[in-house]
Amino acid sequence: MRETVSTNITGARAAAGWLYLVAAATALNSLTVFNYGRFVDLIVGLSFTQLIDAVFVGMALEPRGAPWLWTAGPALMFDIPIVLLLLVLAVKVSRRRKRVAQFSFWLYAVDTFVFLLMFAANVTSHARLRILVLPGLTIVGHTVGLFILYRASRHARCTCALA
């Protein structure tokens, strides 16, 4: 019995740590795009924010010479709530909330599926192997995250409320 409780707490801490890592990587991905003008995939960041950033980077091409805040500001308005959502989910998962852990798992599963679709598009377009390495590592990293979140959702306490 004591070993099971210890495993549950460790799984919840691991899942919360993973969500904190995803939130940090997502924020760094977004800031890197707008500060340096290029995408740097930190393997565990969310695809949702990368797609949002890509739209606003594309919009930054016209007019030329637009200030940084003019292009990055709207994208960060979308990215910041997503990062805050990840932080709230991490806190709730650390308290071993079953439904929140399940929601986190499914949210990350959808994100992994989006990365799989992007990877499949690269493969079908006959991209060079060097270009496929980083998306492949991203899928591996997301699979590890899914495993951690799945374990936390299985061993979390069952609560009636979503909060």
Label each residue range with its predicted role.
Residues 1-163:
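Topology signature of small-to-medium multi-pass alpha-helical membrane proteins
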